[in-house]
Amino acid sequence: MKDLKHLIYFENLLEDANNELVRQAQADGSIVLGYTCYHIPEVLLNVDNCISVRLRAPKTGSLDISTYYMSNYTCDYARALVERAIEGGYQFLDALIGVDACSAMNRSMEHFEVLKVNSKEKFFVTHTDMPLKVTDYYIDAYTTQMREHVLNRLTETFGVDTSD
C-alpha cells in the first residue's frame, strides 16, 4: 500500500503530454521533441540536450474541429492529435518527428504545419520513410533517413551535438 502513492504520481504524469517532468526539463534548457510512432528510435531523440515525448491526447472530448480538417474515416488517434494541437495543447514542443507509416498520421502531421499550430519560431515537423524489409539496403536507407531528417535537422535548427 505504501507504493500506491508512487504509482498514482506516475499515473498522473500520463494524463498530460506536457507533464511536470517535461516542463522541468524544458525549464532546464532541454529541447522537447514530440513523436507519434514506435518506428522512431527514441535513442536518437534523446541526444545532447533533447528529450522525447510520445504524443497522446488523453481526455479528448469532441473531435469536431479535427474532423472538419480530416475525414471522419481517419483514425481517432490522428484526429485527436490534430484536435489537441488546434486547441494549443502542443505549444510546448520544439519539433515533431514522424514516420510515413500510415496516411492518417501523415495527414495529421501535415496539419501541424499547414495550420501552424505551434507558434515557436524554430518549430519544425519532419517525416522519415520506413524500411520495407530488414536487408542491408533498407538499413542503409533508414540510417540515411534518420541522419538527414532527424539528426541533421536538430543540429541545423538547435545546434544539437549528434556526433556520438
Describe the residue ranges of each PLM region.
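An N-terminal assembly and electron-transfer interface module characteristic of large anaerobic redox
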Residues: 1-164
